[in-house]
Regions:
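Alpha-helix capping and helix-loop boundary segments enriched in small/acidic/polar residues
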Residues: 78, 107-110, 154-162, 210-214, ...
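Generic N-terminal targeting/processing segments that precede catalytic cores or assembly contacts
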Residues: 1-102, 233, 240-281
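Active-site-proximal catalytic alpha-helix in oxidoreductases
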Residues: 112, 155-172, 194-199, 217-224
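Functionally critical mobile loop/hinge segments
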Residues: 176-281
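Core alpha/beta catalytic barrel or barrel-like domain that forms the active/cofactor pocket
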Residues: 105-108, 146-157, 200-207
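Conserved phosphate/anionic-ligand binding catalytic regions in large, soluble enzymes, centered on
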Residues: 101-119, 161-166
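Acidic-glycine-rich active-site phosphate/pyrophosphate-binding loop
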Residues: 81-98, 131-150, 195-203, 238-241, ...
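Alpha-helical support elements that line or immediately flank enzyme active sites
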Residues: 117-128, 174-179
């Protein structure tokens, strides 16, 4: 919990503490670490572009180019507005690229890979106020707190550990991008993660496609809503670190059927079983 304590005690912003951690961990210079983050951001941008320009399809037939469909339908009259709407489209696009065996960056997992980049890339394109590098270090710092105190593995703690973590990472990084304080970033992370406590991991046919991809989109909307609340001064009644602990404890209490085994939840509905039979039998 060394990094967690630094975040709680230091006056430095989360992105700076995360960068310092990576410098010490990797034994590389500040310039090298920032350059590597830039390279990974470019991988995420490429995935977003691919998934919105190409109709990504998978052999299962469950992925049918929804990223391109969403992006193409965006307009000034979109219900979610330009920032959230484009973020949702990017999240779906990136998650579809992952399902189609394309190159992505796990943020923090492959199954939740669309949330952080979807939200941040859209934010940058719409506001154009600053570079994204620091924002992704903020996201990684929130991720490190979760890693030190809980898990990202849905097989251990359900989908709250995956999509809940990614939403927390995204919401905190949105807050810092918009000039919010560290406390506001942590409040946003707490607010967003609370929405996913006890969420089942129940992938249809054992594939990271349904409901995983659409959960990425919903998590983007969640992250912006949580960031908006925190930036306005709304506080989380429960501190982020305690929310992380609750996510971990509750997730581990889920039956194994709801922890990535595809033996419960959506995975055993009548339609899901027909899909599984068609794909696997």
């Amino acid at each position: 919990m060394e990094f967690t304590q630094k975040v709680l005690r230091s006056e430095k912003p989360i992105h700076e503490l995360a960068l310092e951690y990576e410098i010490n961990y990797a034994g590389k210079s500040r310039a090298d670490i920032r350059s590597e983050m830039g390279r990974r951001i470019n991988v995420m941008r490429d995935a977003a572009l691919k998934g919105t320009e190409q109709e990504i399809r998978t052999r299962s037939g469950l992925v049918v180019g929804n990223g391109k469909k969403l992006y193409s339908s965006l307009s000034e009259n979109s219900l979610t507005g330009p920032i959230v709407g484009k973020g949702i489209a990017y999240a779906v696009a990136i998650a579809e690229v992952n399902a189609g065996m394309g190159v992505i960056v796990a943020t923090p997992t492959a199954g939740s890979c669309g949330v952080v980049p979807g939200a941040l890339i859209s934010l940058e394109e719409n506001l154009q106020s600053k570079n994204l590098t620091e924002s992704f270090f903020t996201a990684s710092g929130i991720g490190l707190i979760i890693a030190e105190n809980a898990t990202f593995a849905a097989a251990v703690a359900g989908c709250g550990a995956e999509i809940g973590s990614s939403a927390a990472m995204a919401s905190a990084s949105i807050v810092e991008y918009c000039g919010g304080s560290k406390k506001q970033a942590l409040d946003a992370a707490a607010i967003s993660m609370k929405s996913y406590l006890g969420l089942a991991c129940d992938p249809v046919a054992g594939l990271v496609e349904v409901p995983c991809i659409k959960r990425n989109a919903i998590a983007v909307a969640n992250s912006f809503a949580s960031a908006e609340m925190a930036l306005s001064g709304v506080e989380s009644a429960i501190p982020f670190l305690e929310v992380v602990g609750a996510m971990h404890r509750l997730g581990k209490k889920l039956p194994s059927s709801l922890r990535e085994t595809s033996r419960g939840g959506l995975a055993v509905t009548k339609t899901a079983l027909k899909i599984r039979s068609r794909i696997l039998d």
